[in-house]
């Protein structure tokens, strides 16, 4: 359901926005251009975030990262447990719809955790997303009802650190 309906809707929305954007540009309709750029940003971000998230998940996941990522987490957060606690807090305190994100700051050359509102708001430029957790209700409600804390805890059992 999540992949076939929600994710597919973002792909369709992005494709529709591209077509409408081309039409608006041909007509030099600047109001429509701005509206469709906004719609494209939202839907394309929804598609990209879900694409990353699916790769972040594995039925054989869990445990902890190794190698460079483990070292970078220890350097940025002090330990894996501190990283996990901060990421969990970011996920469980998203107000409304959004994501928890671990990203690589290409300017500061370090890992950062932040909340993403909707799909793209509060997502800093220059960040490469590495680990995402979908905190929209559609991601957890069928299985976890309104207990998003349990969903965020269970996430650690399926994180694909090999990705």
Curated annotation (Swiss-Prot):
Catalytic activity: 2 superoxide + 2 H(+) = H2O2 + O2
Enzyme class: oxidoreductase
Cofactor binding annotation: Binds 1 Mn(2+) ion per subunit.
EC number in record: 1.15.1.1
Transmembrane segments: none
Alphabetic keyword roster: Manganese, Metal-binding, Oxidoreductase
Cofactor(s) this protein requires: Mn(2+)
Gene3D superfamilies per the UniProt record, alphabetical: Fe,Mn superoxide dismutase (SOD) domain (1.10.287.990), Iron/manganese superoxide dismutase, C-terminal domain (3.55.40.20)
Protein's job: Destroys superoxide anion radicals which are normally produced within the cells and which are toxic to biological systems.
Record-stated family: Belongs to the iron/manganese superoxide dismutase family.
The protein, known as: Superoxide dismutase [Mn]
Source organism phylogeny: Bacteria, Bacillati, Actinomycetota, Actinomycetes, Mycobacteriales
Chain's gene name: sodA
């Amino acid at each position: 359901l999540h992949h076939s309906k929600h994710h597919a809707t973002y792909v369709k929305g992005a494709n529709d926005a591209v077509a409408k954007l081309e039409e608006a540009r041909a007509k030099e309709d600047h109001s429509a251009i701005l509206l469709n750029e906004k719609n494209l940003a939202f839907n394309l971000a929804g598609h990209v975030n879900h694409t990353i998230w699916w790769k972040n998940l594995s039925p054989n996941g869990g445990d902890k990262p190794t190698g460079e990522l483990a070292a970078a987490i220890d350097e940025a957060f002090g330990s894996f447990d501190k990283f996990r606690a901060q990421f969990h807090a970011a996920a469980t305190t998203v107000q409304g719809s959004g994501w928890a994100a671990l990203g690589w700051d290409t300017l500061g050359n370090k890992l950062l955790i932040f909340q993403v509102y909707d799909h793209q708001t509060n997502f800093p430029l220059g960040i490469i997303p590495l680990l995402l957790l979908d905190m929209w209700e559609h991601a957890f409600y069928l299985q976890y009802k309104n207990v998003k804390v349990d969903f965020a805890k269970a996430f650690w059992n399926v994180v694909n650190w090999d990705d």
